[in-house]
Amino acid sequence: MSVNNWLNKKVKEYSHQKIDLLILKDLVNKLEIKPPKKIISITGTNGKGSTANLINTILKKNSYSTGLYTSPPLIDYNERIKINEKNILNEQLKKYFLKIEKKFAKENLNFYQLFS
């Protein structure tokens, strides 16, 4: 089964659950993620993906290491997560999703919370 088909199945499994963005901060704390020194967060109604990709390209061209998360994907789930302008590999995507899903099995999270 392709990663996209597998993740589409996961979306259906979790689609009944309510989205609560406040939970995300607690999830990040539980994962003990140490954020990089600088983070750029882009908000608003229109143009977030284009702006994020433009900034990402400028930073990369100036020798910065970059990570980019955008949502929703246009074609494949892999395009949501980029490291130095390259989409995350299928194997990595599935590995990390399963790891997070297992860690938070008792949390009753929706797909967005698990994937973000």
Language-model features: locations:
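Short functional linear segments
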Residues: 1-44, 51-53, 57-62, 69, ...
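ATP-dependent carboxylate-amine ligase catalytic core
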Residues: 21, 28, 32-35, 61-116
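Short active-site-proximal "capping" loops at secondary-structure junctions
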Residues: 46-48, 73-74
